[in-house]
């Protein structure tokens, strides 16, 4: 820092109030649906690399007693003619992970769901309202839930609605 002639105190003051933008590895303790659970909000963007990374990162979260690892995924958009193939390629990564259940919403992410192991399959939702209405039944106390998808799918707003029950940021 000294070589670059940077003032550490000034830098510290700049970063003290830094908050990760919504939908980008935003980890929250949530109290909603009469349950307490952890939400990892990755809902702002999705491409093949970020989706694979987010899925693999779920393996690094230490599982607590009676905790399930759930993911809710939506489409990766703007992939063109390779969209189905790229969505399908996520399934083996999920199948090798310690994720318990996968829930999906969207046209292309069904390709992922169709290639999942039977024990990993949660549910395909027709729309986000249906998903929101069912989440109270799906979520258990202490669950770890990651939400990941392209912003244009509306998943970011879905995540914001869940966070309205937020206790505090982890």
Give a label for each model feature.
Residues 1-170:
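ATP-dependent carboxylate-amine ligase
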């Amino acid at each position: 820092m000294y070589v670059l002639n940077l003032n550490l105190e000034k830098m510290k003051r700049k970063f003290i109030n830094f908050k990760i933008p919504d939908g980008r590895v935003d980890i929250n303790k949530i109290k909603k649906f009469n349950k307490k659970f952890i939400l990892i909000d990755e809902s702002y963007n999705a491409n093949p690399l970020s989706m694979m990374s987010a899925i693999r990162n779920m393996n690094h979260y230490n599982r607590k007693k009676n905790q399930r690892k759930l993911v809710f995924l939506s489409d990766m958009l703007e992939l063109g003619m390779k969209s189905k193939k790229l969505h399908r390629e996520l399934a083996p990564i999920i199948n090798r992970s310690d994720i318990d259940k996968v829930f999906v919403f969207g046209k292309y992410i069904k390709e992922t769901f169709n290639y999942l192991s039977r024990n990993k399959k949660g549910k395909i939702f027709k729309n986000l309202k249906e998903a929101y209405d069912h989440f109270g039944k799906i979520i258990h106390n202490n669950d770890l839930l990651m939400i990941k998808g392209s912003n244009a799918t509306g998943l970011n707003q879905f995540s914001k609605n869940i966070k309205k029950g937020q206790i505090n940021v982890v």
